[in-house]
């Protein structure tokens, strides 16, 4: 038992230390980096929306990829310091309250929407999976609303109840999709990422 715990701690320390050395607040950056290396989801000059962006690793990484000609906006209910890059902005608020005033502020012309959000977990697998799926459905609705036709969507979800229904919804709005588990994710973790490409024309907000 001790050796297993030690192994888990070493795994956690490796990615945490690696992130800190690279100047990122959380090791989640390596999950996005893996997807970026594989598919080039982010490109210079793009406009990107990062839902639930705190503590800011994905926001910072995306801003580095899109460069000075691009723009990244991060949204989260939790407070966070403004990014130190001029092409990145943090807005504190509910990412799912897409009022007309808010849409006028951020626009409807995003190339990519990212969501690394996770629900507050209970430890009950089915309950946590359903909570994750509900969060992802809300993220998908936001993405479909603000993405340009042809845009891309990246979302973390827990495997389990609600997963298949979410994939069906992704297929409705995106021409192609992939399901991916990064190497930097714990093997025993049920979290997985869904990537949707080439958003179909039109928009729809779920109520």
UniProtKB/Swiss-Prot annotation:
Q: Where does the chain bind S-adenosyl-L-methionine?
A: 56, 58, 76, 94, 116
Free-text function comment from the UniProt entry: Specifically methylates the uridine in position 2552 of 23S rRNA at the 2'-O position of the ribose in the fully assembled 50S ribosomal subunit.
Q: What GO molecular-function term can you cite, just one?
A: rRNA (uridine-2'-O-)-methyltransferase activity
- Quote the subcellular location field of this record: Cytoplasm
Family membership, please give it: Belongs to the class I-like SAM-binding methyltransferase superfamily. RNA methyltransferase RlmE family.
Catalytic site positions: 156 (proton acceptor)
| Name the record gives this protein | Ribosomal RNA large subunit methyltransferase E
Question: Which PANTHER family does the UniProt record give?
Answer: RIBOSOMAL RNA METHYLTRANSFERASE, RRNA METHYLTRANSFERASE 2, MITOCHONDRIAL
- Tell me the organism: Desulfatibacillum aliphaticivorans
Instruction: Name the EC number(s).
Output: 2.1.1.166
Q: Which UniProt keywords apply?
A: Cytoplasm, Methyltransferase, rRNA processing, S-adenosyl-L-methionine, Transferase
